[in-house]
């Protein structure tokens, strides 16, 4: 799994002009599923994201987690994180998991994360418009294959 983690003041996702999900302070996650991903990748990602200390404490140090601040997550499926740009000018996305597998793992990831923090979701495979106000900005890339 490849996940772009962005600390946000607020974020929302719209589909066909209608808001499908919105959060206040928390994390916007762009979630890509690879062909070799499985349950252990989900467990690792959920553990890291829910405990990652990237929110400021009273002294301004990044010392608090999403759970500590009682924040929320907006999770967006993002197969383009597996783009291959080596040849030509048009990215290839053959490195991403097939849609059936990716959808199942994406939903499982969100279900597991939702046991720890509130999660709003985009719609897998939909054309979405994502709006956000970055906080910091703080943007971290998590790759479950690089542990």
UniProtKB/Swiss-Prot annotation:
UniProt-listed Enzyme Commission number(s): 3.1.1.96
Compartments, as annotated in UniProt: Cytoplasm
Coiled coil: none
Reactions catalysed: glycyl-tRNA(Ala) + H2O = tRNA(Ala) + glycine + H(+); a D-aminoacyl-tRNA + H2O = a tRNA + a D-alpha-amino acid + H(+)
GO CC entries: cytoplasm
Domain of life: Bacteria
Pfam family, one: Tyr_Deacylase
Enzyme class: hydrolase
Record remark on domains: A Gly-cisPro motif from one monomer fits into the active site of the other monomer to allow specific chiral rejection of L-amino acids.
Database matches in HAMAP family: Deacylase_Dtd
Subunit structure, interactors included: Homodimer.
Protein name per Swiss-Prot or TrEMBL: D-aminoacyl-tRNA deacylase
Organism from which the protein derives: Streptococcus equi subsp. zooepidemicus (strain MGCS10565)
């Amino acid at each position: 799994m490849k996940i772009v983690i962005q600390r946000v003041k607020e974020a929302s996702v719209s589909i066909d002009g209608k808001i499908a999900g919105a959060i206040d302070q928390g994390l916007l996650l762009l979630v890509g599923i690879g062909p070799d991903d499985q349950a252990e990748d989900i467990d690792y990602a959920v553990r890291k994201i829910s405990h990652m200390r990237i929110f400021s404490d009273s002294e301004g140090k990044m010392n608090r987690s999403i759970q500590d601040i009682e924040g929320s997550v907006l999770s967006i499926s993002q197969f383009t994180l597996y783009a291959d740009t080596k040849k030509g000018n048009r990215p290839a996305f053959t490195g991403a998991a097939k849609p059936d597998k990716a959808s199942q793992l994406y939903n499982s990831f969100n279900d597991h994360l939702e046991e720890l923090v509130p999660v709003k979701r985009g719609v897998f495979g939909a054309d979405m418009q994502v709006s956000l106000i970055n906080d910091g900005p703080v943007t971290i890339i998590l790759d479950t294959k690089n542990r």
